[in-house]
Amino acid sequence: MGTKIKTHKGTKKRFRLSAKGKAMHRQSGTSHLAKGLSKKRRRNLRGTTAVAECMEPTIHAALNGHSY
């Protein structure tokens, strides 16, 4: 009987799975020094966006407690 592999907590805080199973994350560039960006750019950085397809298996594995 082996031990379970734990969920990676850093990944859990940064990523969420959508209803269809896609990994979603917040966009970068809004924490500070955003005043220099146009309002349109700041508005478009709001919300979440899907992760690149090549990273999906790694993120799913980290969230579901599997080794990768």
UniProtKB/Swiss-Prot annotation:
GO terms for cellular component: cytosolic large ribosomal subunit. GO terms for molecular function: structural constituent of ribosome. The keyword Ribosomal protein applies. It comes from Rhodopirellula baltica (strain DSM 10527 / NCIMB 13988 / SH1). One of its GO terms (biological process) is translation. This is Large ribosomal subunit protein bL35. The keyword 4Fe-4S does not apply. Residues 1-43 are annotated as: Disordered. Signal peptide: none annotated. Pfam families: Ribosomal_L35p (PF01632). Residues 1-25 have a biased composition (Basic residues). HAMAP family: Ribosomal_bL35. Belongs to the bacterial ribosomal protein bL35 family. Keywords: Ribonucleoprotein, Ribosomal protein.
